[in-house]
């Protein structure tokens, strides 16, 4: 390799400077991750070369045997990671190693918790793994040449992690990247064959290409041969191609960490080989935690796609529906061509058939997790429940299956935890109940004592309490489960069916008839703010409620539309009053029209507050309430 020429000194992007300081001064409890990250990057470089060489075989430069080499020099206190993958041009080195184009660094810094172990685990997830080299090194030198460029177009990138880096042109006959770490004082233990082999075994055994280290000679063989002998220190076979019976849980877990860029263990996995009409292997994982960008429109999602063990692309989104975007893993097909493109993957019988089967496989995996490990499923639900709730709208064919995986709070459990499955609810239904009742609201605390629940508590009927912002939208698609319809208890057309006896219904009709005059007076007082005023048959303790009018949007859906800047259609609630409540009896007896109007307005505003709505005229409400309080205290 010739001497550096055309040398430049450049400054790191501001966020990278912050990141380097963090790496150097904070993440020192789990130092060995540097090797995991650099080897993972080298494996990705090999995958990229394989893919590009499908179209341009010349990129292989006569050598298609890809490998990673890890070496060390005790005396010089260096560790070297060398690959013969795709390599980098000078421009690549500046852009990839000096700046971070995406918002990965800023997001990484924002998500730091102060817990070293947790923070170290975030490194790969946020695509900043290269900088972990500075945990153990006070100087990092990168020598690289992109495949297809002449030897004279090599690049030497160098930095001490202090805010600047140097980049220079250099001759590099071999394509690929060599990273030389000058270890800090006190980190000499990493310049050791046994230590490096153990770290590689722990983190990188699953990598699908050989990781080589120099053969070490001891005792009588201590004299090193003239040429170093290299030996493979990992299994170097694609994990998913091996029989399930031969793979340990720890191997699946390490493979997940590599494929998902996550240092935590998965909650579950499913490894399957399909033969017959289609021939493919899949290995799917359920992560243990949600990525920071799960709900970002342009977040990374999809499976790693291989065709006949040749890497084709990351993030092949076509094999799973969007609501399962959190599933990680690989699919290796023998039915797709090696020159498959994202456009070709958009449709077609092979892709559609694989998507259908993989979706079912993923849902089966979640069902098994829920059944066998409910605590782990609760963890899954906390992380990914809202994404799964998109399922009934997106995946009609699996609507019932997805519904069975959903979890809600309910009046059966006073903790407010989202732990109730629909099958649990159905199993607890009372005699004569043929509907599944639910109530939506902003929070469990806000709706657990809602007046809408009073009649259900009286009759001992469980009501699901839906408090995620997506829930009302979800229920517009999830209309039934187990052949039983869902009913929103906040709607004005609530019918309890067989749960009300004929005697109850007759008595209700008589009371409604006797209070028609009061209903008319209240309607006149409230005017156009209500669609209708009527006697309520659902209240036992509260004086009044506001029910949702027929065909109107509920409060949650209106708030969702407002937040997204969409026009919200005008709605008018139904005002229902409890004729047996003392306040309503006083209202009925009130002859002063102004006072009657004030009382009616106060009851209307209180009902709106109880429903979680905001008041159109809060100052008017306070004024009327103060006036009534003064009269009471006079």
Curated annotation (Swiss-Prot):
Pfam families: HATPase_c_3 (PF13589), HSP90 (PF00183). Residues 1-342 are annotated as: A. The keyword Transmembrane helix does not apply. Residues 560-634 are annotated as: C. Residues 343-559 are annotated as: B. SUPFAM superfamilies: ATPase domain of HSP90 chaperone/DNA topoisomerase II/histidine kinase (SSF55874), HSP90 C-terminal domain (SSF110942), Ribosomal protein S5 domain 2-like (SSF54211). It is found in: Cytoplasm. SMART domains: HATPase_c. PROSITE patterns: HSP90. Keywords: ATP-binding, Chaperone, Cytoplasm, Nucleotide-binding, Stress response. GO terms for cellular component: cytoplasm. One of its GO terms (molecular function) is ATP hydrolysis activity. Coiled coil: none annotated. Belongs to the heat shock protein 90 family. Homodimer. This is Chaperone protein HtpG. It comes from Xanthomonas campestris pv. campestris (strain 8004). The gene is htpG.
